[in-house]
Amino acid sequence: YLYPGYQGAAYLGSAFNPFQLNMKQKYLAGRSTTKIQKAPVLENLQEQGGRVQGRVSLLESLDQINRDIDQSGSIEALDRYQQEAVDMVLSGRARAAFDIDRESDALRDLYGRGPWGHYTLMARRLVEQGVSFVTVDMPHWDNHSKIKDALEDRLPYLDRAVAGLLEDLKQRGMLDDTLVVVMGEFGRTPKLNSGQPGIPIPGRDHWGQAMSVILAGGGLKTGQVIGATNSKAEHPVARALKPDDVLATIYTVLGIDPQTNFQDFAGRPVPLVDHGQAIRGIL
C-alpha cells in the first residue's frame, strides 16, 4: 500500500492487512521538482542471514507463552506477518521492486517526475514482482475552496501517471492481466460554493449522487463510456450504476464470485457485495 490512508482488513482479520509504505510526500503531486524520498524500507532490506534467523528463533520462543492462551487467532495472524517480513528482508526481489533508480530516465519521464508518477511506477514494479494488489493513494481532492487552482495543479500529474502506467503495462504485455482502477469516494457538488471560512474562493462540496470511475486493462472491453448524467452532472439519467456494481465487476475480473459469503471471526456471514452486479458490456 503506497501511502497511508483508509486501509485495514477490518472483519477479514489482521492477517489480511496491507503492507504500508509510509511516505510523507503524498500532498506534493504538483511539485515535479520535489526530490523524491527513497522508501525507508530500502534501508532495511539488507540480507543479514543468520542474524535475522537467530532473532526469529528467539521471538518464537517468547511468543509460545502467549500462543498457548490465544483464542482470537491474532498470534496466528502475527506469525504470517512475521514470516512475510523475514521473506522480504532475505529476498532480493523486494529490494529490487522498491528501487526506482533501476528504471531509465525516459520511463520515469513517461510517468512524470513528481511523487504521484514515482509511486505509480513503483506500483508497476511491485506487480511485476508478483504483488497481487497495490493501492497508490493520491489524496487532496477535497477542495471545498480554491478548486480551480487545485485541479489545474493536480490533474496534469494524475493524467500523466495513469497514462504512463497504461502505456508501460501495454508495452510489457501486462495490461490484459492487470486491472487498473482509478476512483475516489464520491463526486463533487454541481454548483460552486463561496469557499470556506477564511478562504473565500469558490470550491465544491461532497456529492453522492454522481461520480466517475476509470477501469482499464484486465481483459475488459475498454474505450467506452458507460452511463450518463444530466447536463449539470447532478444525477444519472442513463445506465445508473452503484458502488456495489463496480465492486462486483472488480471481483469478477479477479475470478472471484461477487455473490460469495464468508464468515468473520464471530461466525457471522458477510457478503462480499450487497446486491451488486458486474457491469454488462465491458466484460
Language model features by range: what are they?
Residues Y1-L283:
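Ligand-binding pockets and gating/stacking loops
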